């Protein structure tokens, strides 16, 4: 059974600041991925989906669930990742979001040669 463990999350301000201070960036139509290599040996995820970009709470929650689920099932290198939403994301279907995420995970993995 796969679980999204607490250790796989970016929870503290210091964790987010670590990524923001010298992050690499992948930009898609729907998301901005900021990532930076860590020394932990596993990937961690932080989400920043603002009310300004996704107005309805149920849409934000749906998208967070999709992001966490996709992250859980993807074998990623040891990086800290912050995902920022872009306008119009709430109108996308789950299938469309998952397709874009899979392409982006592949791109991110290729940056680290895993």
UniProtKB/Swiss-Prot annotation:
Enumerate the Pfam families for this protein. Ribonuclease_P (PF00825)
User: Which reactions fall under this protein's catalytic activity?
Assistant: Endonucleolytic cleavage of RNA, removing 5'-extranucleotides from tRNA precursor
- GO cellular component term of the entry, any: ribonuclease P complex
Q: Which Gene3D superfamilies does this entry report, sorted A to Z?
A: 3.30.230.10
EC no. given is 3.1.26.5
| Keywords attached to this entry | Endonuclease, Hydrolase, Nuclease, RNA-binding, tRNA processing
**Could you provide one GO biological process annotation from this protein's UniProt record?**
tRNA 5'-leader removal
Keyword set includes Protein biosynthesis: no
> Which GO molecular function entries does the Swiss-Prot or TrEMBL record give?
3'-tRNA processing endoribonuclease activity; ribonuclease P activity; tRNA binding
Organism superkingdom: Bacteria
Q: What class of enzyme is it?
A: hydrolase
Q: How does it assemble?
A: Consists of a catalytic RNA component (M1 or rnpB) and a protein subunit.
The Swiss-Prot or TrEMBL record describes its family as follows:
Belongs to the RnpA family.
Q: What does this protein do?
A: RNaseP catalyzes the removal of the 5'-leader sequence from pre-tRNA to produce the mature 5'-terminus. It can also cleave other RNA substrates such as 4.5S RNA. The protein component plays an auxiliary but essential role in vivo by binding to the 5'-leader sequence and broadening the substrate specificity of the ribozyme.
Mind telling me what this protein is named? Ribonuclease P protein component
Q: Which organism is it from?
A: Legionella pneumophila (strain Lens)
């Amino acid at each position: 059974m796969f679980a999204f463990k607490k250790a796989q999350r970016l929870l503290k301000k210091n964790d987010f600041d670590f990524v923001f201070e010298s992050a690499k960036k992948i930009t898609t139509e729907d998301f901005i991925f900021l990532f930076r290599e860590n020394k932990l040996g596993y990937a961690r995820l932080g989400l920043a989906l603002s009310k300004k970009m996704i107005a309805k709470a149920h849409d934000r929650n749906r998208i967070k669930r999709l992001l966490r689920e996709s992250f859980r099932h993807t074998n990623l290198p040891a990086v800290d990742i912050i995902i920022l939403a872009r306008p119009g994301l709430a109108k996308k279907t789950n299938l469309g979001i998952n397709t874009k995420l899979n392409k982006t995970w592949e791109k991110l993995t290729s940056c680290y040669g895993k």
